[in-house]
Amino acid sequence: MISEIQQRYQAVRARITQAALQASRNPDDVQLLAVSKTFAAEQVREVAALGQRDFGENYVQEGVDKIAVLKDVPGLVWHCIGPLQSNKTRPVAEHFDWVHSVDRLKIAQRLSEQRPAHLPPLNICLQVNIDGGSTKAGVSPTDALALARAVSVLPRLVLRGLMTIPDPV
């Protein structure tokens, strides 16, 4: 019998396939980032067994704990997608593959300094507050280019793009 989590995952994959085909795209070119916060490590393992490899965590310690439990699963890619405070940069630098919420040079510098030399550079996205909402984190659009330039020279980071959260329509 198929579990609820398997059904949900397969339904999302089916929607991605349908949307990709409608847009004349190859569904295999669409990457799903499964947000695994609040799900147990064994549920993540179940979805990984279906082929999912990229998982996003909002909470650093919860993510670090899951990464440790699931280290026997090959090919998992871990994304830190939540806000990042400077006192949490070390475990992120040591355990995650991606950070989607870099909004200050200080955070980027700490991540670069704390990234172990035996690991590949940490992939990062700059979080940009595109609508100026005071409740949202992120660098302002006017300061984003300067931050990108400063981050792009840090030796243990690779700037991959931007992360934005628009106001709901």
Which residues make up each language-model segment?
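Conserved alpha/beta-domain cores
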Residues: 1-169
